[in-house]
């Protein structure tokens, strides 16, 4: 039951933050709020993944922040809908949005994992393991 509560709390906070970012509004041409939510959410999930990689497992914290907060904050459904609408109305913008979102999402997640490992000390432990 604690797991459900952790995901619920994180998801509620993440969804509220996503709503706040959406209030900033996007342009009629490019859906900046969703782009910002998904790329920053990828960075945050990467940070959490890297940070908890070498730390004692804290499943409730991980569920609250990873599954709950990041899951509530990021939005695959809005990304998909916006991509389809852009492809139908302005194909070149739709392709740009699709490629930029995927490339930035993956790069930010990778960067987050690297930074998270460095902050937690996991990077040094991995280096020692390979040098032994």
Curated annotation (Swiss-Prot):
<keyword id="KW-0812">Transmembrane</keyword>
<dbReference type="GO" id="GO:0140114">
    <property type="term" value="P:cellular detoxification of fluoride"/>
</dbReference>
<keyword id="KW-0472">Membrane</keyword>
<dbReference type="GO" id="GO:0062054">
    <property type="term" value="F:fluoride channel activity"/>
</dbReference>
<dbReference type="InterPro" id="IPR003691">
    <property type="entry name" value="FluC"/>
</dbReference>
<keyword id="KW-0406">Ion transport</keyword>
<keyword id="KW-0915">Sodium</keyword>
<feature type="transmembrane region" description="Helical">
    <location>
        <begin position="34"/>
        <end position="54"/>
    </location>
</feature>
<dbReference type="Pfam" id="PF02537">
    <property type="entry name" value="CRCB"/>
</dbReference>
<keyword id="KW-1003">Cell membrane</keyword>
<feature type="transmembrane region" description="Helical">
    <location>
        <begin position="95"/>
        <end position="115"/>
    </location>
</feature>
<protein>
    <recommendedName>
        <fullName>Fluoride-specific ion channel FluC 2</fullName>
    </recommendedName>
</protein>
<dbReference type="GO" id="GO:0005886">
    <property type="term" value="C:plasma membrane"/>
</dbReference>
<feature type="binding site">
    <location>
        <position position="71"/>
    </location>
    <ligand>
        <name>Na(+)</name>
    </ligand>
</feature>
<feature type="binding site">
    <location>
        <position position="74"/>
    </location>
    <ligand>
        <name>Na(+)</name>
    </ligand>
</feature>
<feature type="transmembrane region" description="Helical">
    <location>
        <begin position="59"/>
        <end position="79"/>
    </location>
</feature>
<keyword id="KW-1133">Transmembrane helix</keyword>
<comment type="similarity">
    <text>Belongs to the fluoride channel Fluc/FEX (TC 1.A.43) family.</text>
</comment>
<comment type="function">
    <text>Fluoride-specific ion channel. Important for reducing fluoride concentration in the cell, thus reducing its toxicity.</text>
</comment>
<keyword id="KW-0407">Ion channel</keyword>
<feature type="transmembrane region" description="Helical">
    <location>
        <begin position="5"/>
        <end position="25"/>
    </location>
</feature>
<keyword id="KW-0479">Metal-binding</keyword>
<dbReference type="GO" id="GO:0046872">
    <property type="term" value="F:metal ion binding"/>
</dbReference>
<keyword id="KW-0813">Transport</keyword>
